[in-house]
A protein has these predicted regions:
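Intrinsically disordered, charged and Pro/Gly-enriched terminal/linker segments
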Residues: 1-80
């Protein structure tokens, strides 16, 4: 649902949906990716970067792994 909302330009709804998905399963990288892209699309690069950092921390603590290349690629739209 969050991905469809983001495609329709409904960034606030996409952020809420992705956050809800992460409350249910914090290891779901696709939800992290959508949340990062939603913040970027909404013009909030700081929030996108903080979201990525939270994702990285959760994955490291829970699984001992780093975010996937797809999750890192979600940051590609950030300035600078």
């Amino acid at each position: 649902m969050a991905n469809a909302q983001l495609r329709r330009g409904q960034t606030t709804a996409a952020i809420r949906s992705a956050e809800l998905a992460l409350e249910l399963d914090s290891l779901r990288e696709t939800a992290w990716q959508i949340l990062i892209r939603s913040h970027t699309t909404a013009g909030n690069p700081g929030s996108a970067l903080r979201t990525y950092q939270r994702c990285r921390q959760v994955l490291h603590q829970q699984l001992g792994t780093a975010p996937s290349p797809d999750t890192r690629a979600a940051l590609d739209g950030l300035p600078g």
